[in-house]
From Swiss-Prot:
EC number: 3.5.1.110
Catalytic reactions of this protein: (Z)-3-ureidoacrylate + H2O + H(+) = (Z)-3-aminoacrylate + NH4(+) + CO2; (Z)-3-ureidoacrylate + H2O = (Z)-3-aminoacrylate + carbamate + H(+); (Z)-2-methylureidoacrylate + H2O + H(+) = (Z)-2-methylaminoacrylate + NH4(+) + CO2
The name this protein goes by in its record: Ureidoacrylate amidohydrolase RutB
Chain segments annotated as transmembrane: none
Keyword Mitochondrion listed: no
Species name: Methylorubrum extorquens (strain PA1)
Keywords: Hydrolase
Amino acid sequence: MDADAPAGYRDPSGRHGAVTLPARPEPVAFDADATVLIVVDMQNAYATKGGYLDLAGFDVSATGPVIERIARAVAAARAAGIRVVWFQNGWDPDYVEAGGPGSPNWHKSNALKTMRRRPEMNQRLLAKGTWDYALVDALTPEPGDIVLPKPRYSGFYNTPLDSMLRARGIRTLVFTGIATNVCVESTLRDGYHREYFGIVLADATHQAGPPALQEGALRNIETFFGWVSDVAAFEAALSSDEARRIPA
């Protein structure tokens, strides 16, 4: 491999032109047909006032622009033929999937702790079929998209994500969504350990907690696990002549 070539996955057959995306810590290349855009947990629970994060005391006031930028990333991906994967985090209405006191999730999940502290919230937070669990109105899956429920922070845990990606020859995962420092980072890390290239579009993500957690998560990702870019760069890369080139 050329030492000056950008990082990332390129089809070794040379049949497809690799897209080069400006990113930190260095530019990263990917093939559109070996890439998915992952939208992590853009549910009312995480992005809307009155949802779980808001009720648990987290600030969701800045999620509006994030939703708009995710919509742009989704539109750019679809126009380039990149499949979109949507995650929804939560459990069955009886919370069997959440685990009981023998599970660390029972002790650490802020949703479960909020419901124990406020019994009137029981079966309202992150329960499948509820408003809290639903995706925000501004973001809607389309036919051909993949929608996956997940019971823990990582999208690889107890889901068919890995097998679905491998069946389609996917090597690069582009991430958007909430929360950067929890489910986004957890899924990207798990992907890294499964040999996927992970890219985060930073301005299409939002942290759970103070802004320092966003900065820390992105720094951690770019230093150890993947690459960090933004929506405008993603749009520009996909609309470039390079992205449209398919060598004979």
